[in-house]
Every structure is written in structure tokens, then in C-alpha cells.
Amino acid sequence: MKSVIYHALSQKEANDSDVQPSGAQRAEAFVRAFLKRSTPRMSPQAREDQLQRKAVVLEYFTRHKRKEKKKKAKGLSARQRRELRLFDIKPEQQRYSLFLPLHELWKQYIRDLCNGLKPDTQPQMIQAKLLKADLHGAIISVTKSKCPSYVGITGILLQETKHIFKIITKEDRLKVIPKLNCVFTVEIDGFISYIYGSKFQLRSSERSAKKFKAKGTIDL
């Protein structure tokens, strides 16, 4: 008798009595009503098909992609580059005429850097620009040196390191000139600039941030 009185109501009995179902039935009814409100344009059959296959995303969801860290390729060290002789100029390429186009490019580069070299251009301005400029391709001459054999050597600058200049002469000879204890001149369009090698012992990439004194010592 007790089991008959307290048995669960069927869906029809609940609807007839206007009684809300409890437990699992109530949860299912709530979910279906919620989905119907959330997807008003979707037909019941389409909604049912979606539920059978996968979860329905009710809000806009952005999946954050993990950024994979790119491994930087490790380059060769300075020692390895020297051992591989990557900076050596091959004998068949040690020809003055081969680098004349480089000199013409350098002259145009300096003209652009100085906004045009005119007769009324201030020499101090040109000097300041040249001290920070890339000199590869410039024609340089040794005017003073503690080693007399260096004096008078003139050629196109091919390579520059912290302590030396490598130049190619008109006789197609590659010369290595130390900066220390040497004074060099650079000429372009009638303007002559002096470089005191002892104060110039920097890599070309470091000179752009270097502050040179307006009046340096002329001692070798």
C-alpha cells in the first residue's frame, strides 16, 4: 500500500497535475529548455544530432595556441671562422681593378652621408662623418708611421679589424697595415681627412657609437 502511494509520477501524471518532475527528469528538462533558449534558430532534430556527436559550445571560445620557441641557429665563432679562412681573399681575386666599383659605391655613400660635398661644406663636418662611417672601399694612404716601410702605401680598403687595415694597391698587392703608430689620410672630392690609427683601434661596427675628441693628439 505504501509503495503505491509514494511511487514516482509518470510524465503524463506530472503534466496533468502541473507538478514539476524531480531528480534526473527535472535536470533533463532544465537542460533541454536551456539549450532551446541558447540555440533558438536550431531545429529540435538538429539540436539532438549535435548532442549525439559532440559538445555544444554556448559561448565564443578562443583556443590559445602555444607559441613554440624557435631555436636560434648557432653561428660560427670567430675562432672557427678564422680556422675556415672565411675572410681570406683568394690570390686570383687580389686585383685592384676588381675593387674599383666598390670605391665608386663608397664615394656615393659618403656624398649621401654628407648631404652632398660642396666647396662650402665645413671640413669639420666631413671629418666627423668619416670617423663614424664605413670605410670599406675608401682609398687610404699611410702618411706617417714609426715603421718607415709603411709610409706611402696607398690602396683601396678591403677589410678592417680592430687593429689592422687590409688594402689592395695599384700593383695588385694585398697589404696588411697596423693601425697602431700610423697616420692615414682619406681623400674624397678634394677633401682630405686624417685618421690617427692609435686612436682608431675599434671595429667598424663600434665606431658609430664612439665619441671622438675634436682635437686629438698627433703623437704616434
UniProtKB/Swiss-Prot annotation:
<dbReference type="GO" id="GO:0004526">
    <property type="term" value="F:ribonuclease P activity"/>
</dbReference>
<comment type="similarity">
    <text>Belongs to the eukaryotic/archaeal RNase P protein component 1 family.</text>
</comment>
<dbReference type="InterPro" id="IPR023534">
    <property type="entry name" value="Rof/RNase_P-like"/>
</dbReference>
<keyword id="KW-0819">tRNA processing</keyword>
<keyword id="KW-0597">Phosphoprotein</keyword>
<keyword id="KW-0539">Nucleus</keyword>
<dbReference type="InterPro" id="IPR016848">
    <property type="entry name" value="RNase_P/MRP_Rpp29-subunit"/>
</dbReference>
<comment type="function">
    <text>Component of ribonuclease P, a ribonucleoprotein complex that generates mature tRNA molecules by cleaving their 5'-ends.</text>
</comment>
<comment type="subunit">
    <text>Component of nuclear RNase P and RNase MRP ribonucleoproteins. RNase P consists of a catalytic RNA moiety and 10 different protein chains; POP1, POP4, POP5, POP7, RPP14, RPP21, RPP25, RPP30, RPP38 and RPP40. Within the RNase P complex, POP1, POP7 and RPP25 form the 'finger' subcomplex, POP5, RPP14, RPP40 and homodimeric RPP30 form the 'palm' subcomplex, and RPP21, POP4 and RPP38 form the 'wrist' subcomplex. All subunits of the RNase P complex interact with the catalytic RNA. Several subunits of RNase P are also part of the RNase MRP complex.</text>
</comment>
<dbReference type="GO" id="GO:0006364">
    <property type="term" value="P:rRNA processing"/>
</dbReference>
<dbReference type="GO" id="GO:0033204">
    <property type="term" value="F:ribonuclease P RNA binding"/>
</dbReference>
<protein>
    <recommendedName>
        <fullName>Ribonuclease P protein subunit p29</fullName>
    </recommendedName>
</protein>
<dbReference type="GO" id="GO:0030681">
    <property type="term" value="C:multimeric ribonuclease P complex"/>
</dbReference>
<dbReference type="InterPro" id="IPR036980">
    <property type="entry name" value="RNase_P/MRP_Rpp29_sf"/>
</dbReference>
<dbReference type="InterPro" id="IPR002730">
    <property type="entry name" value="Rpp29/RNP1"/>
</dbReference>
<feature type="modified residue" description="Phosphoserine">
    <location>
        <position position="10"/>
    </location>
</feature>
<dbReference type="GO" id="GO:0001682">
    <property type="term" value="P:tRNA 5'-leader removal"/>
</dbReference>
<dbReference type="GO" id="GO:0005654">
    <property type="term" value="C:nucleoplasm"/>
</dbReference>
<dbReference type="Pfam" id="PF01868">
    <property type="entry name" value="RNase_P-MRP_p29"/>
</dbReference>
<dbReference type="GO" id="GO:0005730">
    <property type="term" value="C:nucleolus"/>
</dbReference>
<dbReference type="GO" id="GO:0000172">
    <property type="term" value="C:ribonuclease MRP complex"/>
</dbReference>
